[in-house]
Design a protein with these regions (language model features):
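Short, amphipathic C-terminal "tail helix"
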Residues: 107-129
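Glycine-rich phosphate/nucleotide-binding loop
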Residues: 2-92, 96-103
Length: 129
């Protein structure tokens, strides 16, 4: 845990050591769950590559998975326990990301030539089964 400023600095530096910030999700959590939390890719909007179809979509997709994981702990099911569907969706998305990173396709920041749409479609297809 860190303040917003230091959390932002750390969330930028950590992923940069991997060679790309296109993989890093981010979450600003309200632990009391009484105010909204924020889930976004570390790289932000990447205006320098807007419209070129070369951005790595993994961080955005993974941020959505983080949101589902967070919701799994805050949304009780009919039995009062955390709703397992959120956790299952999170796990399916993360597994699809992992498989895509191992087998491809890969965007230019990962040494490949796949477009944003191709990478996103590959992950979506794996989630869909």
């Amino acid at each position: 845990a860190a303040t917003n400023l230091f959390g932002d600095i750390l969330s930028d530096l950590g992923p940069a050591t991997t060679g790309t910030i296109g993989l890093a999700p981010s979450a600003n959590l309200n632990p009391e769950r009484c105010f909204p939390s924020l889930f976004e890719p570390v790289h932000g909007s990447a205006p320098d590559i807007y419209g070129q179809n070369i951005a790595n979509p993994v961080a955005m997709i993974w941020s959505g998975a983080l949101m589902l994981d967070f919701l799994a702990g805050s949304r009780p099911g009919a039995d009062g326990r955390p709703d397992a569907r959120f956790r299952q969706a999170h796990d399916a998305i993360v597994q699809a990301i992992e498989v895509a990173l191992i087998t491809g396709p890969r965007t230019p920041d990962l040494g490949g030539n796949a477009s944003t749409q191709e990478m996103g479609a590959a992950i979506a297809a794996r989630v869909a089964g």
